[in-house]
């Protein structure tokens, strides 16, 4: 089971997630707390809108209520477009100014947030834009993954180099 603290830029970090029983998972699934492909997952408690990503594969993993699931109506807005809009600094500021409550633990009030309006291009224009945005997002994700692999490699090799150990 994931919470906001497990969210990263492109998905969940499962290193510290809480494991729950099959029975509890089924209850959460019945409560619609298991993301589906193309759902937009949004950190809504604490650092609201800090982490936002598209669920790219169905998994048997539940999320806590600190994460909102936005399930776009694809007849109106495509998931890539909604993701792009929600990541805009102007949207984040507007949401912070108008749809967040609480000072110690700020959180998005979802019933109010549903009133948020975007000006959207036609679905044809969205499809063209979504293709470009998806390709850019995937390239960035690949770059982030490669950077993490290189960091791990550096952290493994550097101590050996410094100590004079043969590699």
Regions found by a protein language model. Give the residues of each.
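ATP-grasp fold ATP-binding core
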Residues: 2
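Sequence-specific dsDNA recognition surfaces
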Residues: 5-40, 63
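Histidine-centered metal-chelating micro-motifs
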Residues: 49-50, 67-69
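Short beta-strand-centered aromatic/proline hotspots
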Residues: 52-57
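A short glycine-rich beta-alpha junction/loop motif
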Residues: 60-68, 100-127
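Amphipathic alpha-helical coiled-coil/heptad-repeat segments
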Residues: 75-77, 84-85, 90-94, 111-167
């Amino acid at each position: 089971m994931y919470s906001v603290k497990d969210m990263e830029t492109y998905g969940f970090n499962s290193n510290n997630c809480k494991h729950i029983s099959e029975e509890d998972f089924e209850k959460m699934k019945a409560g619609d707390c298991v993301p589906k492909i193309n759902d937009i997952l949004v950190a809504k408690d604490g650092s609201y809108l800090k982490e936002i990503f598209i669920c790219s594969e169905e998994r048997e993993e539940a999320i806590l209520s600190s994460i909102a699931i936005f399930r776009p109506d694809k007849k109106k807005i495509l998931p890539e477009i909604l993701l792009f809009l929600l990541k805009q600094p102007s949207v984040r500021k507007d949401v912070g100014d108008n749809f967040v409550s609480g000072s110690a633990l700020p959180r998005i009030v979802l019933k109010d947030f549903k009133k948020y309006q975007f000006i959207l291009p036609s679905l044809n224009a969205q499809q063209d834009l979504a293709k470009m945005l998806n390709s850019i997002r995937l390239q960035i994700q690949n770059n982030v993954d490669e950077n993490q692999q290189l960091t791990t490699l550096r952290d493994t090799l550097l101590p050996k180099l410094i100590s004079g150990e043969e590699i």
